[in-house]
Amino acid sequence: MSDPSPKRFETLQLHAGQEPDPATNSRAVPIYATTSYTFNDSAHGARLFGLKEFGNIYSRIMNPTVDVFEKRIAALEGGVAAVAASSGQAAQFMAISALAHAGDNIVSTSNLYGGTYNQFKVLFPRLGITTKFVQGDKAEDIAAAIDDRTKAVYVETIGNPRYNVPDFEVIAKVAHEKGIPLVVDNTFGAGGYFVRPIEHGADIVVHSATKWIGGHGTTIGGVVVDSGKFDWGKNAARFPQFTQPSEGYHGLNFWETFGPIAFAIRVRVEILRDLGSALNPFAAQQLILGLETLSLRAERHASNALALANWLKKNDHVSWVSYVGLEEHSSHEVAKKYLKRGFGGVLSFGVKGEAAVGSQVVDNFKLISNLANVGDSKTLAIHPWSTTHEQLTDQERIDSGVTEDAIRISVGTEHIDDIIADFEQSFAATFKVVRSA
């Protein structure tokens, strides 16, 4: 007899992790605006605090509304469990700090979002964790950088802002041969719609849920997804925090007690508990609403982005276009291997003339908003050199894939003709001034 449970993305985004509320029969996910939860008796409370029984204690650690969001994301990504956070940066921090301690390092591509690059370059070294940045994402270069103190390999699904797509399976093989988990930031993968890195060897996935998952520019959030596939017991020497007695839980062994969900449990009950970067239930409800239309929006984002990229290629004012959906992009063939539902919703381009001309193009948009975000249903533009990557040195910006003339566009779900019309009027206004100068 076939399994009747839903497995398709479009159904999971609406139903995974939730049944109608048993107390009220509410079909929508209720917002549980509570700090804490009553215990049935003192023994029940003791079992919860001792991790001998699952349940709610305090909303800094777990909340029923947040729990639905976590279960839904885990289902969409093909993981066994997820832990939500107050932002993508917090989720990323929790994932890495659960793996690496003072004296350890991680190996990461240099093709990173500016905030990630700064977290790895500035914040983690203050905690004794260093990052070995590899130029690009070639597996052989990553392998060469791994040493006995390496605790993770880190890549982005679609690198921001170079839009490179790593060969996940090859990189995962390299990491696993060394006994190290592969961590993938799948933010640009739109909650697993464009690609599920876990299906290609990733062990841990992180998201800024602020972007396509939320999808409307209203809510900051993040999430860590545990694949449940990494064998912490086999790699006990490198990761004793999962296999040796926990000082904070009277000698509890996470791997022996929780098996495949050991990573997610430790992130929740040690890192999230102590860091305090919890997602609040109101934000979780907004992100759940975003998930319900994710596939519809992502499909439109991708089709609009491809159409805009092709239009820009033919425009006389444009000197170059970078979008992984274009055949000439260096990652296009790899992208076709992994991105089966579209090539994402972000592109960059440069205009002819001095670098300042690019800023004028952004300033002259009327429909398109100039702001620091991606994944909104509205089309967004920004000049990364002077904003998202401004805190990096010139060489670090170039290494990350940012050039002084680059304009990044997060393509929204408006009608493509209206998006193009805004480009046309902006170009007309900009180059009229340039010609008259």
From Swiss-Prot:
Pathway note: Amino-acid biosynthesis; L-methionine biosynthesis via de novo pathway; L-homocysteine from O-acetyl-L-homoserine
EC number: 2.5.1.49
A single Gene Ontology CC term: cytoplasm
Subcellular location: Cytoplasm
Primary location group: cytoplasm
Catalytic activity: O-acetyl-L-homoserine + methanethiol = L-methionine + acetate + H(+); O-acetyl-L-homoserine + hydrogen sulfide = L-homocysteine + acetate
Residues recorded with modification N6-(pyridoxal phosphate)lysine: 211
Mutation effect (residue 333 to G): In strain: JAM 2006
Factors inducing expression: Up-regulated under sulfur limitation and down-regulated by high methionine concentrations.
GO biological process, one term: cysteine metabolic process
Domain of life per record: Eukaryota
InterPro entries assigned: Cys/Met-Metab_PyrdxlP-dep_enz (IPR000277), Cys_met_metab_PP (IPR054542), OAc-hSer/O-AcSer_sulfhydrylase (IPR006235), PyrdxlP-dep_Trfase (IPR015424), PyrdxlP-dep_Trfase_major (IPR015421), PyrdxlP-dep_Trfase_small (IPR015422)
Additional free-text comment from the UniProt record: E.nidulans has another enzyme having cysteine synthase (O-acetylserine sulfhydrylase) activity (cysB) that has been shown to be the enzyme of physiological importance in cysteine biosynthesis.
Function: Catalyzes the conversion of O-acetyl-L-homoserine (OAH) into homocysteine in the methionine biosynthesis pathway. Also has cysteine synthase (O-acetylserine sulfhydrylase) activity in vitro, but seems only be involved in the alternative pathway of methionine biosynthesis in E.nidulans.
Similarity annotation: Belongs to the trans-sulfuration enzymes family.
Subunit structure, interactors included: Oligomer, probably homohexamer.
Protein name (Swiss-Prot/TrEMBL): Homocysteine synthase
Source organism: Emericella nidulans (strain FGSC A4 / ATCC 38163 / CBS 112.46 / NRRL 194 / M139)
